[in-house]
């Protein structure tokens, strides 16, 4: 999907509510620094100082919209950044620009970092000829999930289920609580109805067979070593060709290619949201006729 179109997924009311909550967190009371800057009309340039994928424009916009500032973008969402590059310009009262600066930079840097990691993962997987789905997980930051899931999609990865209502996933603890694999899947199928898929986490071929026989749509082969994963998936698919197989657990950018295979439909990586490094951006105020260029990071 075109990254530019992904912003249509984000409800304006949700964007405004998130932006307001982030600003409230950073400045719940008096902003003493505003007495230093004053409220004169000002402008600032957003610079990208590290390579990666630009993601998070809607959140950046929402933050400054709350502060009556205007953002003009020079690069579209999903652009590949080559530092140092001028990404956007923000205009508004000086004290409002600086009130939104850190919150907006944090959000953009984090979202872009996740998009960059996702794009790398997809590129690595595609280099093997594998055509399945690279996906994130539900291992996200509380209160920041929308940003992180959106970043995955800008980077070309699937966001997996957005929340508990997106799919019924039966994990080991659910099986223990239900009393058996079969009972857990039966209850999941009853809850899912016709509109939701049921996925079951399995740690052995025997569990995978039981899950598929009980009616699972997807079987997650969790924490399998690559040399065990592929024969297990092949055996499962031979018996249950309509069941999709997800590989998860221990997957990184370094070993991702080892998990790509004919019988694997989805590979999920928690590190895309848990370990992706943030990109480096800066927002610099400037006077008319004077646009400072920050130094790029050294790699």
From Swiss-Prot:
Region of interest called Important for hexamer formation, as start-end residue ranges on this chain: 8-12
Pathway: Cofactor biosynthesis; NAD(+) biosynthesis; nicotinate D-ribonucleotide from quinolinate: step 1/1
Alphabetized UniProt keyword annotations: Glycosyltransferase, Phosphoprotein, Pyridine nucleotide biosynthesis, Transferase
Residue numbers carrying Phosphothreonine: 291
Positions that bind quinolinate: 102, 138-139, 160-161, 171, 201, 222, 248-250, 270
SUPFAM superfamilies recorded: Nicotinate/Quinolinate PRTase C-terminal domain-like (SSF51690), Nicotinate/Quinolinate PRTase N-terminal domain-like (SSF54675)
Signal peptide segment: none
Family: Belongs to the NadC/ModD family.
Job description of the protein: Involved in the catabolism of quinolinic acid (QA).
Subunit structure: Hexamer formed by 3 homodimers.
Protein's UniProt name: Nicotinate-nucleotide pyrophosphorylase [carboxylating]
Native source organism of the sequence: Mus musculus
């Amino acid at each position: 999907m075109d990254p530019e179109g992904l912003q249509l997924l984000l409800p304006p009311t949700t964007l405004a509510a998130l932006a307001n909550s982030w600003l409230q967190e950073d400045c719940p009371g008096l902003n003493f620094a505003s007495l230093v800057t004053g409220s004169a009309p000002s402008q600032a340039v957003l610079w990208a100082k590290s390579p990666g994928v630009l993601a998070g424009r809607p959140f950046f916009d929402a933050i400054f919209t709350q502060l009556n500032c205007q953002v003009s973008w020079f690069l579209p969402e999903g652009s590949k950044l080559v530092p140092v590059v001028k990404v956007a310009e923000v205009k508004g009262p000086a004290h409002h620009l600086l009130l939104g600066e850190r919150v907006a930079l944090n959000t953009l840097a984090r979202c872009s970092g996740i998009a960059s990691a996702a794009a790398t993962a997809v590129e690595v997987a595609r280099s093997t000829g594998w055509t399945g789905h690279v996906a994130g997980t539900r291992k996200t930051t509380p209160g920041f999930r929308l940003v992180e899931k959106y970043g995955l999609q800008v980077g070309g990865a699937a966001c997996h289920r957005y929340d508990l209502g997106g799919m019924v996933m039966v994990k080991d603890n659910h099986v223990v609580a239900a009393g058996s694999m079969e009972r857990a899947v039966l209850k999941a199928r009853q809850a899912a109805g016709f509109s939701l898929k049921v996925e079951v986490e399995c740690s052995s071929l025997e569990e995978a067979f039981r899950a598929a026989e009980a009616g699972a749509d997807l079987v997650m082969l969790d924490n399998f070593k690559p040399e065990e994963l592929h024969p297990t998936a092949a055996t499962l698919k031979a018996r249950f060709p309509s069941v999709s197989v997800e590989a998860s657990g221990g997957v990184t950018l370094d070993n991702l290619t080892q998990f790509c295979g004919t019988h694997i439909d989805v590979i999920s990586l928690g590190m895309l949201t848990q370990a992706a490094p943030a990109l480096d951006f800066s927002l610099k105020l400037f006077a008319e006729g004077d646009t400072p260029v920050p130094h790029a990071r050294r790699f």
